[in-house]
Amino acid sequence: MDFTNRTARCRLYLSDSLLVNKICKDIQAHLYEKFSPSTIAERLKMNYSYLSRHFKQETGKTITEFINEVKIKEGTRLLETTEMPLIQISTQLGFSSQNYFQTVFKKITGVTPIEYRTKT
């Protein structure tokens, strides 16, 4: 299943659970920040273990996987619509390094950010 289909599939789950909706809205609201699932739990004033377990049961993926997919989706948009250097995109999206951004990007999309940019 390609990257676009996986993100679309996750969106299907959003209407099934109020808590999943809250988590996804929080991720979108803080997309350009460095944060973790435990940060989301703190912001939602919820137990981290419960939050993680519920999200995984409802969506079939971890909160971290979903965060990375949303950030990489935004990364693809930035690669398509801007000339921003990779280091700036990775920093803007809250990745700890350009290398980590590239690793996550390739894992999710199947190509490197440079390959993606040259194809679009």
Regions found by a protein language model. Give the residues of each.
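Short, Lys/Arg-enriched, Trp-marked, Pro/Gly-tolerant hinge/linker segments that flank
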Residues: 1-25, 29, 38-44, 57-65, ...
